[in-house]
Amino acid sequence: MIKKILISQPEPTSEKSPYFDIAKEYGVELVFRPFIKVEGLSSKEFRQQKISLLDFTAVVFTSRHAIDNYFKLAKELRINIPEDMKYFCVTETIALYIQKYVQYRKRKVFFGNTGKIDDLIPMMVKHKNEKYLVPLSSVHNDIVAKLLDSKKLNHKECVMYRTVSNDFTEEEAKAFDCDMLVFFSPTGIKAFTKNFPSFTQGDVRIA
């Protein structure tokens, strides 16, 4: 019988999350513990890509991590981002997150409605003279690059952050007693096996 489930994601901030409905309906305890975390590249590591942030007139953001690390690197490199820099975001939520770093109204911010890069392309084509920088994770595919190439847009992809194992403390490892594990990516599974090299599934359910 499943009584305790380990969810490999951060705990939801909203009380309306379906996770809490599941816990209440089935009488199970949910433990939220991310197995992976995002780590930004240092300015030294970023310089090795030989990319200058000021060579671009627009930035494409696909996540909040991209925004955080873009502005973190700009600060570390002592670069002042121009007031007329344009930002293209895959969702409105990501676009609004920019307010953490700059005055939203003073910027030219564009966002899609579907959460997919395809939705942004028409807007980017309207600004075809821009030079686009696309911050990415160390683990990424070339879908964005191919889409921008297909529209003959001037762009450059760069790595600004990476996904690493969020290691368990010795106390956490000893206290591990969950009946079910819920993973969301191969990276999460890899991180778990790193922390529990002698883990045997037994009666533990995995989803």
Segments the model singles out, each with a brief description of its role:
Residues 1-207:
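Conserved beta-alpha
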